[in-house]
Amino acid sequence: METIFAQSSAFGKAGVAVFRISGPKSLEVLQLLTGRKDFKSRLMYYQQITVPETKELIDNVMVVYFKSPGSFTGEDVVEIHTHGSKAISIMLTNALLNIAGIRLAEAGEFTKRAFLNNKLDLTAAEGIADLINAETIMQHKQAIRQASGKLEALYNNWRSQLLKILSLLEAYIDFPDEDIPDTVLNEVTNTHTILVNTISEYLNDNRKGELLRSGLKLAIIGPPNVGKSSLLNFLMQRDIAIVSNIAGTTRDIIEGHLDIGGYPIILQDTAGIREESSDIIEQEGIKRAINSAKTADIKIIMFDAEKLDSSINEDIINLIDENTITIINKIDLIEASKIFSIENKYKCLRVSVKNNIALSSILKNIENIAENMAGFTETPYITNQRHRNYLQQALSHLTAFSLDNDLVLATEDIRMTARCIGAITGVINVEEILGEIFKNFCIGK
């Protein structure tokens, strides 16, 4: 196995930068950089590091050596903590590249080696990637649980039950003349039924884990000049959309990212929807707005308190569902009695975006819907389409299983189910998917 290195921290100015080296030559490389031979595992040392050929000083650093297998990758590992300077990073990188037998790591290669050395399974590796990419508290909770092995434990439990069924069935096949009790087949049937129900229910999760991982899409919908862009700017706490009293100012979808109650929200301000427009570009914007609303996880539909009759058209009303927040904007410009019937019919919130009236109620409603759609529970959810695909295949094989069929074919259904579950955690040969998983990591991880 080659020795690899990379800067694990972000490149640029910082208090500290961390370089990681992994592989059989790690300790030798450290000795070349420092001129010291007596490093003990798991002790931090304050050292000078120099360019091996010229002895030019690179930096005063902290270094630590982890002897195999007691490291993240399971190999000999060295970490070098330098000052966070671009010049130091470049000098150290060049010095390492000039040492024979060491190369720059590929994206995710350290974690890939940890997997190959049985330090973690594939779900934990994916959890680490999600942890690095987590931007909200709820994303962190989900990722840290997965990185800690909770998904692995769940899938391994199912696989263990399948392997037990497999062993009982193979005993029937291999020893047909033996007097095997009927209770054995009863156990197979009962376990099979439980697994079918459990995996079916698990798949019927409304993609909560995947929504939390990727973010919930929220579309702001309404007629032109109702205050959609002003609401987007309020939610983002900065001006990212042009606000104008000219109808049709927003022509395309404007997007921003937000953390509401720990949930990742992808905000989309859309073109105003109206029934008639002679502007070809605006017509395309309206088409995109409707499509955006149809694919959104959460919708905010805005009505104009001064123009309720024109605000409410069929295209907009048809978009309302259980995950829609309807609001009447500009309530400061009209008497409450004039909007009472519409407010009750569509369960609207009364707000004024311009004057910051009741806007906190919008945030609370978004958080409540997000919690219902992607709320954190004790049972780990599916977080990745790869897992879902294998679980659907597993359920297909499991559903096909029947003791009324040929016993050899029934056994093969169980074997294929176990293989699908094993492919999620990586206990079977999954070389063809490793590149796809680890390419999404950053260099140095």
UniProtKB/Swiss-Prot annotation:
Localization, UniProt: Cytoplasm
| Entry binding sites for GTP | 225-230, 244-250, 269-272
Q: Which GO terms describe its molecular function?
A: GTP binding; GTPase activity; metal ion binding
Q: Where does K(+) bind?
A: 225, 244, 246, 249
Where along this sequence does the record place binding of Mg(2+)?
A: 229, 250
> What are the coiled-coil residue ranges?
none
Q: What cofactor does this protein call for?
A: K(+)
Domain TrmE-type G: from-to ranges = 215-371
Q: Does the keyword Nucleotidyltransferase apply?
A: no
GO CC annotation, single: cytoplasm
UniProt GO BP: tRNA methylation; tRNA wobble uridine modification
Q: Which residues bind (6S)-5-formyl-5,6,7,8-tetrahydrofolate?
A: 20, 79, 119, 445
Main site of residence?
cytoplasm
Q: Cross-referenced PANTHER family, in alphabetical order?
A: TRNA MODIFICATION GTPASE GTPBP3, TRNA MODIFICATION GTPASE GTPBP3, MITOCHONDRIAL
Q: What is the recorded function of this protein according to its Swiss-Prot or TrEMBL entry? A: Exhibits a very high intrinsic GTPase hydrolysis rate. Involved in the addition of a carboxymethylaminomethyl (cmnm) group at the wobble position (U34) of certain tRNAs, forming tRNA-cmnm(5)s(2)U34.
Q: How does it assemble?
A: Homodimer. Heterotetramer of two MnmE and two MnmG subunits.
Q: What protein family is recorded?
A: Belongs to the TRAFAC class TrmE-Era-EngA-EngB-Septin-like GTPase superfamily. TrmE GTPase family.
This protein's name: tRNA modification GTPase MnmE
Q: Which organism is it from?
A: Rickettsia rickettsii (strain Sheila Smith)
Specify the taxonomic lineage.
Bacteria, Pseudomonadati, Pseudomonadota, Alphaproteobacteria, Rickettsiales
